[in-house]
Each structure stands twice: as structure tokens, then as C-alpha cells.
Design a protein with these regions (language model features):
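Extended, histidine- and acidic-residue-enriched regions that form the cofactor-binding/catalytic faces
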Residues: 1-221, 227-389
Length: 389
């Protein structure tokens, strides 16, 4: 009988140690028949399950064009193949025609099985009853986080913040399921890291907004738990605003980074500048609070020897005025930026509360912005008097 394990619960050294012929499966949705999958793989000793892709395909409740979904997922599978994993596949629902749902870069990248518990016709996502709310779009990633944290850090953190925000202001916001895959431009440096590719990532999220705007939604907040997503989300916001002139679509730099978050970080942090970056005091504290069983604090190594100059250095809220992307290998031996040894679960609890409070405030601002702007448009303000589109 095959043993299934969760790929994203491993640390990057544990991924590096995996046999390159172990099957790694990225499923579209959940509820697949795992014994049938094992049989299709010839019953290997072990099978790694990657986080389920939450939506985008027919029957998921939020369908995108096949070419957009295929490029996004194809890049993820290619990431694993490029790292030498010869049996990396996307698990897709097989249609009634017995044909795979979409085409990936190579046919062998895909395993299609008949639907089991996966719904054929899921309810619309979000439900139509959520129109008028800010639609939260939490996006994490599956990537290395030092020696002591799993690949799932960014996903767990932003999911907790997004769900916490929706629960705090349920009449004002609705959270989509978290997306566990983003963009990493440092992917080859440390094992385990995937990347959707910048342009495919932008096309996917712009496609999500296109679909939801067509259904009558008009307020969106793209929330990221992974720094590598940031610049691409800015582009999505710009494209969305240009394409759909009567919506309000926003993003922000990560989380715990506005006035509320900055004050909380300053109050409770014990590391110096350079101690908060990646697999650091902040992210490790979040994980000690949210998923302590996945933290291996005995392996934590503080990495604060970032090559710093006055306009280019590393910390959560600071980094100088220069924007650059040198190899991670220049500044870290273990994949961490910061001082994870300073982390505590109590700090994680306090910082999560601050992050949720901050995001709830952003929700209110998005509502205010959209309402005030629509009022001006309807009054015929400026050029809106001659162009109402």
C-alpha cells in the first residue's frame, strides 16, 4: 500500500533528500480517490501530495480559460521536473469524454482520473449573495523557509489573516480559498520551491477578476503572504483598473506592514534590523502560533549577514530605496533572512491580531473608495459627464 505524505509540510533539506523518482502529485481540488491514484502510479512505496489547486477549472465554481490555467499549472509542474523529479504530475478530473481537462507542456505531466468526491458542478465561487462585499484573494506560496520551517509558511500565514479578516467583518468581506502557489525568481537556489511564472501569474489573477466582474463583483483585495508575488500583483491591479474602470481593485505590501502592524512589530520584536525578512522572527512566530507541530526550532539558524548598503538592506518594513534581485545564495546559507531564534508563539498571536485589524481597516477603505468614486461618476464629475463607461 502506498504511503501518501504532504509535500508542503517538508523543509527544503527534506525535499532535497527525496528520491527523484518519488511521484509528486498536484491535484486540482480535493476529494480524489487516492487508492485509484496509487494504482495508476503502479503502487509506489511513497507518493507526495502537493497542496490542492483551489479553483480555475470547470466544476470548481470559478472557471478560467483553459490556456490561462494550463500555463499556471504547467509552470508549477515544470519547476519540479527541472529539479529532477521525473514523476511530477498534475491530477485532473477526467471528463465524460475520457479526455484530460487541459493540455500541459507535455502530455506526460498529467494524470486524469474520473471524478470521485470532486463536485462536477460546484456552486458559484464566491456565492452570488456576496456581491457588494470586498472579495479577499489570499495568495501564499510553496517555497523553502530555512532549515526549521515547512514550505507552506506563506500559505498558512496569509490564509489565517484573510479568514480572520472575513470573520472580523463578515458583512463587509468574503475570502476566497487560499492559493498556495505564487512566483519565486530565486527558485533554483534551494530545493522544494515552485514558481507559477510572473506572466502566467498575472494572467491568472487578471482572469479571476474578469470572471468576477462579469458576475457583478466590483471590490477586490489581492492579499499576499509571499514577497515574490508583490510586484506582479501591482501589475494585476494596474491592468484590472485599466480594463474595468468602475471597480476598485487593490493590493498591499504583504501584511503586518502598515501603521498598526509596524507599531506591533516595534513593540514586541527582540531582533535588530535585519532580523525580520524570511523564515525570520516574524514568520517563525506566526507559525509557532498557527502550526507549532511543523516548526523545528532546534534546526533554526539566524541569518543576518545580508550585504547591506545605505539604500539596499533587508528587514520586513525597511529595505532602502533601491530595488534589486541578486541571488539569494549571496546572503544566506540556509535559505533564511533574519533571526528565527527570537520567535515565540505569543508574538505570533499578537502579530496575527494586528495583521487582521490592519486588513479589516483596508476593507473599510476599499468600500469607502468605491462608494465615493461611484458617487462622483454618477454625478458626471469631469470627463465622466461625457464618458460613463
Amino acid at each position: 500500500m502506498s504511503e501518501f505524505f504532504n509535500y508542503d509540510e517538508l523543509t527544503w533539506p527534506e525535499v532535497a533528500a527525496l528520491s527523484r523518482d518519488v511521484p509528486l502529485i498536484l491535484p486540482l481540488g480535493t476529494g480524489h480517490d487516492l487508492p485509484r491514484l496509487a494504482a495508476a502510479l503502479a503502487n509506489p512505496a511513497r507518493v507526495g501530495l502537493l497542496p490542492a489547486f483551489p479553483f480555475g477549472w470547470r466544476g470548481s465554481g470559478l472557471e478560467l480559460p483553459k490556456i490561462i490555467l494550463g500555463r499556471y499549472v504547467g509552470n508549477l509542474i515544470s519547476s519540479l521536473r527541472e529539479d529532477g523529479f521525473t514523476r511530477a504530475y498534475c491530477l485532473t478530473p477526467q471528463g465524460e469524454s475520457a479526455e484530460p481537462y487541459f493540455q500541459l507542456p507535455k502530455p506526460e505531466y498529467q494524470i486524469a482520473l474520473p471524478l470521485s468526491n470532486v463536485a462536477r458542478d460546484a456552486s458559484p465561487l464566491p456565492p452570488d449573495t456576496e456581491r457588494g462585499k470586498v472579495i479577499l484573494m489570499p495568495i501564499g506560496h510553496t517555497e523553502q523557509h530555512g532549515l526549521h520551517l515547512p514550505l507552506s509558511v506563506d500559505t498558512h500565514i496569509i490564509n489565517a489573516i484573510s479568514q480572520g479578516t472575513a470573520n472580523k467583518v463578515p458583512q463587509r468581506a468574503y475570502s476566497l480559498p487560499v492559493m498556495p502557489y505564487g512566483v519565486s525568481t530565486h527558485r533554483p537556489s534551494f530545493a522544494g520551491t515552485l514558481s507559477a511564472g510572473g506572466r502566467s501569474f498575472e494572467d491568472f489573477w487578471l482572469g479571476v477578476i474578469d470572471v468576477l466582474v462579469a458576475r457583478g463583483f466590483e471590490r477586490f483585495y489581492l492579499m499576499s503572504g509571499h514577497g515574490g508575488n508583490t510586484s506582479f500583483l501591482v501589475n494585476v491591479v494596474k491592468y484590472a483598473g485599466e480594463r474595468h474602470r468602475r471597480i476598485f481593485c487593490a493590493t498591499a505590501f504583504l501584511h503586518t506592514s502598515g501603521p498598526i502592524g509596524a507599531a506591533a512589530l516595534e513593540k514586541y520584536r527582540t531582533s535588530k534590523i535585519g532580523g525580520m525578512g524570511h523564515a525570520c522572527e516574524l514568520e517563525t512566530s506566526f507559525m509557532l502560533h498557527l502550526r507549532p507541530e511543523l516548526c523545528h526550532m532546534e534546526r533554526a539558524v539566524d541569518e543576518t549577514d545580508f550585504i547591506s548598503t545605505p539604500s539596499y538592506y533587508m528587514d520586513w518594513l525597511e529595505g532602502g530605496s533601491l530595488v534589486a534581485n541578486p541571488p539569494w545564495d549571496d546572503d544566506t546559507r540556509t535559505g533564511a533572512y533574519g533571526a528565527g531564534s527570537h520567535a515565540t508563539a505569543e508574538k505570533g498571536r499578537l502579530w496575527l491580531e494586528s495583521a487582521i485589524m490592519e486588513k479589516a481597516g483596508h476593507v473599510e477603505e476599499i468600500h469607502e473608495q468605491q462608494e465615493r468614486r461611484e458617487a462622483r461618476r454618477n454625478e458626471g464629475f469631469g470627463l465622466w459627464g461625457t464618458n460613463s463607461k
